[in-house]
């Protein structure tokens, strides 16, 4: 799959997954890989910088959780600003997706 096409969807999908519930980084990557039948395989080098940017922008917040003697995980959750951004990004994606599909469908109709 074209990685350039996938890059623009990273923050949208992160926000969408976090709307369901708080998740840690590996859980986000595993969930998106499973739900896209492997089309999206997020690497740490792209996922964590995106998470940090979303956190810096106030769209998500992070909290360490776990047992004191056990392994702690950094869980990310959506903020109210993140919910608003998700709504905007979802609407923008729907418009872009519709426009691209119209062009592709018309191209195939003419062939």
Where does each model-flagged region fall?
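Amphipathic alpha-helical dimerization/coiled-coil segments
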Residues: 84-111
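Glycine-centered, phosphate/nucleic-acid-interacting loop/turn motifs that mediate DNA/RNA or nucleotide
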Residues: 58
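Basic, amphipathic "hinge/linker" alpha-helix immediately C-terminal to the N-terminal HTH DNA-binding motif
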Residues: 68-90
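Short secondary-structure boundary/capping segments
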Residues: 32, 52, 67-68
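Basic amphipathic alpha-helical segments that dock to polyanions
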Residues: 47-54
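Short beta-strand "wing" residues that participate in macromolecule-binding interfaces
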Residues: 62
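N-terminal helix-turn-helix DNA-binding core of bacterial DNA-binding proteins
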Residues: 2-46
């Amino acid at each position: 799959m074209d990685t350039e096409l996938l890059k623009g969807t990273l923050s949208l999908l992160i926000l969408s997954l976090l709307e369901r519930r708080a998740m840690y980084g590996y859980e986000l990557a595993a969930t998106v890989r499973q739900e896209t039948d492997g089309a999206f395989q997020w690497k740490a080098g792209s996922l964590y910088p995106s998470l940090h940017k979303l956190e810096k922008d106030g769209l998500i917040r992070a909290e360490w959780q776990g047992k004191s003697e056990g392994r702690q995980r950094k869980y990310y959750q959506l903020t109210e600003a993140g919910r608003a951004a998700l709504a905007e990004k979802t609407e923008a994606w729907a418009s872009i997706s519709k426009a691209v599909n119209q062009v592709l469908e018309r191209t195939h109709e003419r062939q």
